[in-house]
């Protein structure tokens, strides 16, 4: 039950610490690297962690007297003790460990020497702190059952057309999502580990150039990613081919479409190593134009939906059954899902979830736990969606961000942002309620792309104004 805090870039010692903690029967507390120093200190203290494992650079932003309950701090570079409260015991232990190991196992350590404690399914083994938008993040209590159910689902899921498992022994994964995030940990680490897959950890920020170079070397058989990865490839590599040059002309000839799509598909597959069986996309909504094009060229993509509170998976569909605009079917047999709406197929309502994946609650936070977990065990996700009779979910937006227009219509900012983000030189956008039934959009231009195309920064305001006019025309239509 002791808590062990863990923060650092993806590397083998991060994984060893994680597995060593939960198989020992303690509770792992992974912390996202991009949290502020204040958030990191809060999580360490709030979780009551006794030990801390971290990348050396993080120790520079933490003062010893800010984490008084921590008894020792270890480096994820080589596991040496950076700090110990009494200044003696750990240093002696580390010095004697090799001698003690040889004494206890004179013939060497074998599989028969491995013993794990009996850990009940409902025991908390993971405290995953969410990246909250207001105030401090909440510690999601996840149990053995929550993690095991997610991993076993992933390990046994197949392409129903080929009968082949997505995660398989000898399969190759390039792990570049942050492992401290529930999505990355479950499907870039635990699932491939459980089936005997080969995991390559990318210990760098996954910039496009670094990522594609790594793909060429690793040649992954499965890729778990966020939408932005594929959206950037579509915008910066595919769109220019379709809008300029020979392909743009050939695209106007119907008989050549399928041949061009095959060429583009092969180029994209080769860029990702050439051996990918499926791209599992999650973590955020995907741009509809990008998704539509990838499906048109028969790119092996599926989009899932989940949240930290479900460790994380709620819905998933094999790529050969995936429906456009959806985020897959909810996991029948593991979860119950219902839409809080009088007409769930047509009118969006809040997604409610109950079952094997649902968290135990928020650590030391009964107030927020009761806000999202009702007496019948339903988790109120805050996400608005419609649902097909077969359980396929179509997310419209967040209940907290929904805007009521002047004519009484429900407006989901995410749907407008989706259109805006696909416009010329738009990198990101945020749609807000401006009051009086009106909305406004904040836009971040793609300065990198503008520079590459020789566009003067002074021209960007007019370009964004043109985008606004085009957006209004689309919304009016």
Q: Predicted regions span which residues?
A:
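Conserved ATP-binding/catalytic segment of the ANL
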Residues: 7, 338, 345-405
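Conserved AMP-binding A3 loop
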Residues: 125-152
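AMP-binding/adenylate-forming catalytic core of the ANL superfamily
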Residues: 35, 52-54, 355, 360-361, ...
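Conserved AMP-binding/adenylation subdomain of ANL enzymes
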Residues: 148-172, 179-266, 275, 300
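Structural core segment of the AMP-binding/adenylate-forming
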Residues: 23-102, 437, 466
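Conserved pre-ATP/AMP-binding loop-to-beta segment of ANL
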Residues: 98-129, 136, 162-172
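Conserved AMP-binding/adenylate-forming
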Residues: 1-35, 176
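Conserved ATP-binding loop and adjacent catalytic segment of the adenylate-forming AMP-binding
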Residues: 200-202, 279, 286-349, 357-360, ...
């Amino acid at each position: 039950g002791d808590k062990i805090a863990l923060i650092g870039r993806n590397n083998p010692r991060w994984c060893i610490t994680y597995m060593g903690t939960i198989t020992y029967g303690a509770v792992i507390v992974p912390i996202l690297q991009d949290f502020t120093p204040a958030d990191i200190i809060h999580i360490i203290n709030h979780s009551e962690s006794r030990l801390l494992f971290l990348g050396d650079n993080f120790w520079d932003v933490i003062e010893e007297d800010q984490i008084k309950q921590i008894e020792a701090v270890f480096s994820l570079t080589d596991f040496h003790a950076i700090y110990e409260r009494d200044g003696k015991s750990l240093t002696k232990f580390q010095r004697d460990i090799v001698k003690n190991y040889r004494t206890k196992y004179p013939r060497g350590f074998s599989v028969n020497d491995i013993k794990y404690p009996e850990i009940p399914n409902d025991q908390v083994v993971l405290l995953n702190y969410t990246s909250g938008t207001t105030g401090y993040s909440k510690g999601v209590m996840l149990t053995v059952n929550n993690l095991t159910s997610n991993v076993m689902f992933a390990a046994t899921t197949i392409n129903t057309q080929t009968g082949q498992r997505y995660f398989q022994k000898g399969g190759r994964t390039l792990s570049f999502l942050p492992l401290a995030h529930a999505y990355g940990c479950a499907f870039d680490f635990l699932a491939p580990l459980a089936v005997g897959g080969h995991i390559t950890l990318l210990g760098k920020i996954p910039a496009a150039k670094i990522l594609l170079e790594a793909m060429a070397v690793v040649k992954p058989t499965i890729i778990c990613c966020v939408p932005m990865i594929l959206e950037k490839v579509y915008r910066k590599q595919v769109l220019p081919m379709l809008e300029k040059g020979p392909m743009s002309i050939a695209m106007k000839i119907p008989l050549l479409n399928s041949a061009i799509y095959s060429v583009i598909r092969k180029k994209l597959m080769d860029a990702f190593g050439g051996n990918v069986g499926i791209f599992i996309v999650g973590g955020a909504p995907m741009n509809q134009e990008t998704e539509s094009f990838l499906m048109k060229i028969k790119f092996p993509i599926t989009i899932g939906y989940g949240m930290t509170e479900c460790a994380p998976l709620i819905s998933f569909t094999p790529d050969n059954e995936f429906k456009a605009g959806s985020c897959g079917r909810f996991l029948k047999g593991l979860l119950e899902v219902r839409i809080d709406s009088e007409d769930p197929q047509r009118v969006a309502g809040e997604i409610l979830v109950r079952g094997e994946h649902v968290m135990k609650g928020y650590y030391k936070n009964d107030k927020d736990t009761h806000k999202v977990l009702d007496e019948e065990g339903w988790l109120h996700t805050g996400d608005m969606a419609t649902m097909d009779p077969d359980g396929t979910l179509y997310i419209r937006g967040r209940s907290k961000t929904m805007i009521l227009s002047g004519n009484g219509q429900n407006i989901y900012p995410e749907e407008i942002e989706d259109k805006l983000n696909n416009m010329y030189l738009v990198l990101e956008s945020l749609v807000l309620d401006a009051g009086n039934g009106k909305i406004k959009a904040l836009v971040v231009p793609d300065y990198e792309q503008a520079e590459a195309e020789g566009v003067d920064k002074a021209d960007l305001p007019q370009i964004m104004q043109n985008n606004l006019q085009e957006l209004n025309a689309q919304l009016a239509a």
